[in-house]
Amino acid sequence: MNTVKTGMLLAAMTALFMGLGFLIGGPKGAMIAFFIAAAMNLFAYWNSDKMVLRMYKARQVDETTAPNYVGIVRQLAQNAGIPMPATYIIDNPQPNAFATGRDPEHAAVAATTGLIKMLTPEELAGVMAHELSHIKNRDTLIMTVTATIAGAISMLANFALFFGGNRNNAGGLIGTLALAILAPMAAALVQMAISRTREYSADAGGAEISGNPLWLASALQRIDEAARRAPNEAAEANPATAHMFIINPLNGRGRDNLFSTHPATGNRIDALRRIAETMGSRSRPWG
């Protein structure tokens, strides 16, 4: 996402936040919400990556503690022409991964123990290349900031449902209930629509970085099947971060529609196979 789109999204999130503030405290509540949102946006810009990593209890590793995993990421970063990101492992049986950070110079990737144990080196390279594509395209800022703001909107909406103090104005009780319910839904829809488009782009970019689209295609199929059998309790507790992962960690079986955080896995695999056909002899083995 470019800077303009990032700014537009943050403005929309701020407007939702202010609307909920208005429900709770009228014009003064909206003004307070504006300053809170501005501070939150600034805080998220600098710290949301650390928050997400802490949320999932990710531990940083290096080539001494996780040589194969870190070595793969290092080679892929060189292929992509970006700085080596910090590498983390999450102790979770569900195979999954995400990238975070405000720019390529301050980025991190995290993979679960389930992912590292299950995949072949080629499949792991396909997944991590996808995550590095997010970093290279500067998607990671919008991923982490929207997760932070959307979560805050959901919490404030719940507060507005019980403590909304402006119910005699601007539509009364019905207006209060409508905005308190619709605001988090709108925030979620923004996340979902952006996530689906971004995932296709990262799949294509990752195929170029790794050199073989079929590695990621194979990994996605295996991850999708395994993720349905392995719940991710941390993600269930923090659903606003679901769009950050390579596969929906909430075990959803939704199709490629308005309410899905990720494109249908089958559609992604088909797209990768088409890319493989066009790459032809350019596809190369790992290592």
Swiss-Prot record:
Cofactor: Zn(2+)
EC supergroup of this enzyme: hydrolase
Keywords annotated in UniProt: Cell inner membrane, Cell membrane, Hydrolase, Membrane, Metal-binding, Metalloprotease, Protease, Transmembrane, Transmembrane helix, Zinc
Transmembrane segment boundaries: 7-26, 30-47, 145-165, 170-190
Gene Ontology BP terms: proteolysis
Signal sequence extent: none
Topology with respect to the bilayer: Multi-pass membrane protein
Record localization: Cell inner membrane
Family: Belongs to the peptidase M48B family.
Identification of the protein by name: Protease HtpX homolog
Species assigned in the record: Parvibaculum lavamentivorans (strain DS-1 / DSM 13023 / NCIMB 13966)
